[in-house]
A protein has these predicted regions:
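Glycine-rich phosphate-binding active-site loops on the catalytic face of alpha/beta enzymes
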Residues: 96-110, 175-186, 231-251
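N-terminal amphipathic alpha-helix/helix-capping segment at the start of soluble metabolic enzymes
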Residues: 1-28, 136-146, 202-210, 257
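Conserved N-terminal beta1-alpha1 strand-loop-helix module at the mouth
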Residues: 2-74, 78-81, 113, 150, ...
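C-terminal alpha-helical cap/extension of soluble enzyme domains
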Residues: 82, 123-136, 148, 154-158, ...
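Alpha-helix-loop-beta-strand connector modules within alpha/beta enzyme cores
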Residues: 57-91, 113-120, 142-145, 193-216, ...
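Conserved anion-binding
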Residues: 84, 94-170, 181-184, 259
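Conserved beta-strand positions in the central sheet of alpha/beta enzyme cores
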Residues: 46-47, 75, 98, 176, ...
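Glycine-enriched alpha-helix->loop->beta-strand junction motifs that scaffold or abut catalytic
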Residues: 41-45, 91-96, 115-117, 169-174, ...
Length: 259
């Protein structure tokens, strides 16, 4: 447990740098209670989604609080690559971001800049907020940049063409395949398991690894998740809170269907 006057160490960022495989879960339910339950299940990371869920900033804060003491590092996906949105997420204590729909090296640089205090970036400087333990972390402003982890999503053919350039941007800690969006852009809308789409994902993984950059993916089907791990994906979300809940409750009801 981090002391009240200490800046938390970013365990996920260090694990990626050390080449450790990281298994995660997608969360969209948006409650601190569900996040607390999930964070204690043994996963390495949890993705708090604000792009495709009704989760707003106070709900992110509740989930960050709920995850304290668990095994999982919180990663927050902002709704867009927007410095104002990102600034607010960082001030409530987010240290890992998954930035959606990054199309170029310039957009990746903008994402990184939004997470860095001057002169390295453009993050607004507040004296007291949750991220610096309400002013108790005295060296927060000089150390915060180093603990930020920026992951960017590759979701289009254009982004694929720019993959190496995006990977080379200083401050980008990892790439992430958005399988549904990328499959849709490739002509396989609604079918991210199409063999041709999977082949593109595999090629992107190989290119990222050649560039020396960790790459992740969402794969809620166990067969797919294991295949992507074998391909060399560094961090994989193997399910979602909604999927786990839906499947469990439907299976439970089915066991009593004949009663």
């Amino acid at each position: 447990m981090t002391a009240p006057n200490e800046l938390p160490r970013n365990a996920f960022k260090r694990a990626l740098r050390e080449g450790q495989r990281q298994i995660g879960l997608w969360t969209s339910l948006g409650t601190g209670t569900s996040a607390e339950i999930l964070a204690g299940a043994g996963f390495d990371w949890l993705l708090i989604d604000t792009e495709h869920s009704p989760t707003e900033l106070p709900m992110v804060l509740d989930q960050l609080r709920g995850m304290e003491g668990g095994t999982a590092t919180p990663i927050v996906r902002p709704a867009w690559n927007d410095a104002v949105i990102i600034k607010r997420l960082l001030d409530v204590g987010t240290q890992c971001l998954l930035v959606p729909y990054v199309q170029s090296a310039e957009e990746a640089r903008r994402a990184v800049a939004a997470t860095r205090y001057p002169p390295e970036g453009i993050r607004g400087v507040a004296v007291v907020h949750r991220a610096n333990r309400y002013g108790r972390v005295k060296d927060y402003h000089t150390r915060a940049n180093a603990e930020m982890c920026v992951l960017v999503q590759i979701e289009t053919r254009r982004a694929l063409a720019e993959l190496e350039a995006i990977a080379a941007v200083e401050g980008v800690d990892g790439l992430f395949i958005g399988p549904s969006d990328l499959a849709g852009d490739l002509g396989f809308l609604g079918n991210n398991r199409h063999p041709d789409a999977v082949a593109v994902f595999a090629d992107a993984c190989a290119r990222a690894r050649k560039a020396g950059k960790p790459i992740g993916i969402l794969a809620p089907v166990e067969e797919d998740a294991r295949r992507y791990l074998e391909m060399g994906f560094s961090y994989v979300a193997v399910g979602s809170d909604i999927g786990v809940l839906r499947n469990a409750v439907e299976q439970l009801r089915q066991r009593f269907a004949a009663d």
